[in-house]
Amino acid sequence: LEEGITAMKIWPFDVAAEKTRGNDISAADLKAALEPFEKIRKAVGDRIDVMVEFHSMWQLLPAMKIAEALRPFATYWHEDPIRMDSLGDLKRYAAASPAPISASETLGSRWAFRDLLETGAAGIVMLDISWCGGLSEARKIAAMAEAWRLPVAPHDCTGPVVLAASTHLSLNAPN
């Protein structure tokens, strides 16, 4: 916080998802995965935003169970909470979630993002320039998100080239 960092993203549910292929989460695994949130809130309260990364590892019902358990922690967003193969399920999740949905770095074109936007499930549009078709396609996706009055959060886990391109996109897109 003293260095100006006001947000962090964590993914403590992955271990539990790997145990069941995302089909269930035990009470013990849920408790263990919530521990980092408890520690963060105890240490800094609400002075830092906490984003939750789900890596698209969960089926709908356990994801909804996790979302409800996260309610007391006022998380900033839930990123790819379920597999992106059912936008209907994502819409159901979004309706029950205490946090907006950030989706989805895994989508590969403006047409996939259009389908996502039309559901109303996404609160934040997360695109990855290296996976969505490059900078030109990302700019078109950002423009669509702007039409829906949604912010864009570029995703990058590949390195400096995509980071630089994402920075250029962020400076160009008003959202």
Regions found by a protein language model. Name each.
Residues 68, 74-77, 85-175:
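Shared catalytic-loop signature of beta/alpha-barrel
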Residues 1-97:
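Metal-dependent enolase-superfamily TIM-barrel catalytic cores that perform enediolate-based chemistry
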